[in-house]
């Protein structure tokens, strides 16, 4: 007799294999796509006195990433100029950030966000943690390849020179993208062993055996770890998130918390990040933009439903209240609708 959790886990696995991720994206390929026509319309919009931002937003937020690459190619053929640099000159502020982000491939976007998080003085640990903890093996391997292509250095090298201690070890291990893939066989003995090892390495003893935590949480498959965290509760008086808060501090604590939340429910993790970026006074636009751009073709529909379920109001509604102008329009198109 399978438990509900196993059935859900199996469904989510099968779902992930049989349903392309884009099925949960809010941005789909445009049906009557014509790259030449789009390139011409964007060229006209850029040349318009005062710049016709509405046309630029309408076109680029309603095309798939692949289609945007075709538009950029057609634009360069037409004008002998790069679309990205033409738009950089024509736009400004948060809208510019969104539009330039949409022109990059997903791996280029992640690579450039990672580079920016480690450039200059200080590290933007939040961005580094979010990307490294939430991307799949395949995505991470592609990011590593593109990062080297773009910056002529290894992502791992940059992480090593920009971080330290156990936090560095965790980031380096995750960035390799070598986690076991979800299999169809459930190994109950290993689930139990891992749960006990996590408990023995942390809450049960004085001090924390961080390398043990790192090896289990970066090497096992997502589905396996979901079961491990469930099982963990039968050994520990605290769940995994509470244990992390008790055992480690600083960037390491932050990274483990992000990682466990991503493993437990990735769309909910992003829904929480989006909520945090807009709650209270002011908006953390950097976080908001990065998620809206990077998840729009991956799992935005799932993120929206988790957001509505947890916060009682739609993501669309929150964005409407928190942003304005063509920047708002661009984000709402990426959101893909109200719930």
Swiss-Prot record:
Chain positions of Annexin repeats: 33-104, 105-176, 189-261, 265-336
Principal location listed in the UniProt entry: secreted
Location(s), subcellular: Secreted, Extracellular space, Extracellular matrix, Basement membrane; Melanosome
Chain positions found as Phosphoserine: 26, 184
Cross-link (Glycyl lysine isopeptide (Lys-Gly) (interchain with G-Cter in SUMO1)): 49
Renumbered residue ranges of the record's region S100A10-binding site: 2-24
Keyword field: Acetylation, Annexin, Basement membrane, Calcium, Calcium/phospholipid-binding, Extracellular matrix, Isopeptide bond, Phosphoprotein, Repeat, Secreted, Ubl conjugation
Record PTM: ISGylated.
Modified residues (Phosphotyrosine): 24, 199
Cross-link Glycyl lysine isopeptide (Lys-Gly) (interchain with G-Cter in SUMO2): where in chain: 49
GO biological process: positive regulation by host of viral process; positive regulation of receptor-mediated endocytosis involved in cholesterol transport; positive regulation of viral life cycle
GO molecular function: calcium ion binding; calcium-dependent phospholipid binding; cytoskeletal protein binding; phosphatidylserine binding; phospholipase inhibitor activity; S100 protein binding
One CC-aspect GO term: AnxA2-p11 complex
Highest taxon in the source lineage: Eukaryota
Chain positions found as N-acetylserine: 2
Conditions for induction: (Microbial infection) Up-regulated following infection by classical swine fever virus (CSFV). Up-regulated by the presence of CSFV envelope glycoprotein E2 alone.
PTM sites of type N6-acetyllysine: 49, 152, 227
Described purpose of this protein according to its UniProt entry: Calcium-regulated membrane-binding protein whose affinity for calcium is greatly enhanced by anionic phospholipids. It binds two calcium ions with high affinity. May be involved in heat-stress response. Inhibits PCSK9-enhanced LDLR degradation, probably reduces PCSK9 protein levels via a translational mechanism but also competes with LDLR for binding with PCSK9. Binds to endosomes damaged by phagocytosis of particulate wear debris and participates in endosomal membrane stabilization, thereby limiting NLRP3 inflammasome activation.
Domain remark from Swiss-Prot or TrEMBL: A pair of annexin repeats may form one binding site for calcium and phospholipid.
Miscellaneous comment in the UniProt entry for this protein: It may cross-link plasma membrane phospholipids with actin and the cytoskeleton and be involved with exocytosis. Treatment of cell with antibodies against the protein reduces classical swine fever virus infection.
Name of the protein: Annexin A2
């Amino acid at each position: 007799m399978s438990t509900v959790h196993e059935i859900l886990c199996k469904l989510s696995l099968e779902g992930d294999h049989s349903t392309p991720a884009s099925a949960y994206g809010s941005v789909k390929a445009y049906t009557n796509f014509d790259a030449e026509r789009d390139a011409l319309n964007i060229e006209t919009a850029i040349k318009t006195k005062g710049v016709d931002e509405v046309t630029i937003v309408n076109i680029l937020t309603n095309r798939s990433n692949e289609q945007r690459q075709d538009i950029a190619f057609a634009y360069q053929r037409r004008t002998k100029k790069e679309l990205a640099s033409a738009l950089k000159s024509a736009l400004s502020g948060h809208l510019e950030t969104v539009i330039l982000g949409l022109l990059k491939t997903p791996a280029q976007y992640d690579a450039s966000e990672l580079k920016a998080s480690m450039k200059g003085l200080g590290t933007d640990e939040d961005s580094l943690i979010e990307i490294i903890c939430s991307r799949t093996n395949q995505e991470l391997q592609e990011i590593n390849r593109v990062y080297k292509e773009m910056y002529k250095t290894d992502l791992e090298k940059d992480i090593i020179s920009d971080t330290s201690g156990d936090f560095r070890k965790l980031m380096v291990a995750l960035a390799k993208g070598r986690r076991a893939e979800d299999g169809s066989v459930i190994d109950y003995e290993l689930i139990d062993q891992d749960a006990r090892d996590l408990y023995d390495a942390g809450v049960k003893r004085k001090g924390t055996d961080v390398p043990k935590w790192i090896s289990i949480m970066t090497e096992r498959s997502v589905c396996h770890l979901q079961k491990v965290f469930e099982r963990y509760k039968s050994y520990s008086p605290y769940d995994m998130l509470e244990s992390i808060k008790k055992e480690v501090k600083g960037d390491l604590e932050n990274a483990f918390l992000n990682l466990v939340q991503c493993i437990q429910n990735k769309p909910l993790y992003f829904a929480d990040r989006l909520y945090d970026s807009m709650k209270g006074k002011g908006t953390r636009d950097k976080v908001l933009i990065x998620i809206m751009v990077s998840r729009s073709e991956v799992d935005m529909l799932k993120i929206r439903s988790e957001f509505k379920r947890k916060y009682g109001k739609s993501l669309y509604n929150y964005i409407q209240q928190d942003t304005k102008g063509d920047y708002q329009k661009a984000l709402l198109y990426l959101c893909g609708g109200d719930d």
